[in-house]
């Protein structure tokens, strides 16, 4: 997916850390089913364009709506932070599209290589950590009565949101350290890639950290929270909070699994060849998540879509409030029934 020259002696170039840089097209095709370079470029440029055209205005509108709502509804602040993370990714896409159009040549220098790759990785980590916090918030609302206290919850949510961004930044740094401008000779060009200097330990460590903290641990936690909440909900439906979490993992699961395959597959193996061929499509799916939340808001607010996009987003946020109130009401009712039972 991304340009990379690493310790693996292989005819394909790939990036072990970033996910939104230029995707290198395979230079040979053991399976005999590669697309042409031009076809890959057209698909990638088209995909980046769609994500940018949907994601930037969509997330901008969503940021405005959630900012206004967050002054009255604490739950809306989660989506404000998520929207900012998605917007970071979306605004970087035109810059990342230029190397694609130039068939791999990186025009932004060393600083641009480090900065653009860091922005997109930061967006990924921030999104998954904020979604983890949102899931925990909904779970505590349902099963910890004291969490309903306005002051306590407000303080806790703010701390988690700030901590999510700080931890995301911290997790971004190790991979950024290995981002370098690399000189290729066939064809001659400068590429922005990852160079571990032959350190297998560094490569495995960064891949493992990204997989655990960017995927597996949040997945287990969120699946547990929303699975329990779904059983407790007074209404049987897919609420906005759950839908956003599911959308994230639909987009990102193939990417994380493919990165593990690329990290552990032996050089020259058919498995590595297949993984690198699949990489452009998988990366595109992951990047598409940054434009997904505005679409979800329009779907959940479709009853008000005839009025305006802003009205639809406002209506969708009501679903989150209903989700919070439904979980709290369900648990409160259960507790009342228990307290009324004869001893």
Swiss-Prot record:
Primary residence: membrane
Glycosylated residues, chain numbering: 3
Swiss-Prot/TrEMBL keywords: Cell membrane, Disulfide bond, G-protein coupled receptor, Glycoprotein, Membrane, Phosphoprotein, Receptor, Transducer, Transmembrane, Transmembrane helix
Location(s) in or outside the cell: Cell membrane
InterPro entries per UniProt: Formyl_rcpt-rel (IPR000826), GPCR_Rhodpsn (IPR000276), GPCR_Rhodpsn_7TM (IPR017452)
Disulfide bonds: 113-192
Membrane-side (Extracellular) residue stretches: 1-44, 102-120, 179-208, 267-280
Gene Ontology cellular component list: apical part of cell; basal plasma membrane; plasma membrane
Gene Ontology process terms (BP): complement receptor mediated signaling pathway; G protein-coupled receptor signaling pathway; inflammatory response; negative regulation of interleukin-6 production; negative regulation of neutrophil chemotaxis; negative regulation of tumor necrosis factor production; phospholipase C-activating G protein-coupled receptor signaling pathway; positive regulation of cytosolic calcium ion concentration
Molecular function per GO: complement component C5a receptor activity; G protein-coupled receptor activity
Chain ranges on the Cytoplasmic side, renumbered to this chain: 68-78, 144-155, 232-243, 301-343
Pfam families in the record: 7tm_1
Residue intervals passing through the bilayer: 45-67, 79-101, 121-143, 156-178, 209-231, 244-266, 281-300
PANTHER family: C5A ANAPHYLATOXIN CHEMOTACTIC RECEPTOR 2, CHEMOTACTIC RECEPTOR
Function recorded in the entry: Receptor for the chemotactic and inflammatory C3a, C4a and C5a anaphylatoxin peptides and also for their dearginated forms ASP/C3adesArg, C4adesArg and C5adesArg respectively. Couples weakly to G(i)-mediated signaling pathways.
Quaternary structure and partners: Interacts with C3 (the anaphylatoxin peptide C3a and the adipogenic hormone ASP); the interaction occurs with higher affinity for ASP, enhancing the phosphorylation and activation of GPR77, recruitment of ARRB2 to the cell surface and endocytosis of GRP77.
Protein name: C5a anaphylatoxin chemotactic receptor 2
Organism: Rattus norvegicus
Gene: C5ar2
